[in-house]
Amino acid sequence: MKNESTFIDVPADSSSAMKGKAPLIGVAKDHTASGSGGYNRGLSIFDFLLRLAAIVAASVAAGTMFTSDETLPFFTQFLQFEAGYDDLPTFQFFVIAMSLVSGYIVLSLPISVVTIVRPLAAAPRLLLLVLDTAVMGLTMAAASSAAAISYVAHNGNQNTNWLPICQQFFDFCQKTSGAVVSSFVAVVFFMILVVLSGVALERH
């Protein structure tokens, strides 16, 4: 009968086994969190690189449009034929808007660095999402309006008797068209940035 009393050790083993299983649950959660953090950090690094590329695109757009002035080599006693961005309010708006966009991207770089250091922080990522969306709208408005004026400069408008001027002001049209293309490249970068922020927030 005394030998049968040895079966009381079984509950102790089961309880110790249950105690041993508890830390494993915590370890699994830690691995999940670290995996999500690593994924978001990768997105944040890509976000930072895209912002550097967007700075280049927006700065090139503003600078090219700003230096697009052209003066024809011939003139009369009373007239000098010159074309510049400041002759058209749309191109003036374009230069101002793209300059503001460039400044914003520079100011957003520290926030992007914060998302790299703290990949699971939602507040900086949400702030970037809201601001990037607003600035993307400004960039798209400037690019679209400048593209419309550039089209008229190249092709004219028969309904309103607006003649194309690019045959005379070739360099001016080339620079303004290049600025418009660069601004649309910046728009594409902003679209990708907004998508990245949305994906990163979804992973939180």
Curated annotation (Swiss-Prot):
Q: Extract one GO BP annotation from the record.
A: cell wall organization
Q: What does this protein do?
A: Regulates membrane-cell wall junctions and localized cell wall deposition. Required for establishment of the Casparian strip membrane domain (CSD) and the subsequent formation of Casparian strips, a cell wall modification of the root endodermis that determines an apoplastic barrier between the intraorganismal apoplasm and the extraorganismal apoplasm and prevents lateral diffusion.
What ranges are annotated Cytoplasmic (topological domains)?
1-41, 114-125, 200-204
Q: What's this protein's name?
A: Casparian strip membrane protein 2
> Per the annotation, which location comes first and is thus the protein's main one?
membrane
Name any one Pfam family assigned in the record.
CASP_dom
UniProt family annotation = Belongs to the Casparian strip membrane proteins (CASP) family.
Q: How does it sit in the membrane?
A: Multi-pass membrane protein
Ranked from the top, the taxonomy reads: Eukaryota, Viridiplantae, Streptophyta, Embryophyta, Tracheophyta
Keyword Nucleotide-binding in record:
no
> Can you quote a single GO CC term?
plasma membrane
Q: How does it assemble?
A: Homodimer and heterodimers.
Transmembrane intervals: 42-62, 93-113, 126-146, 179-199
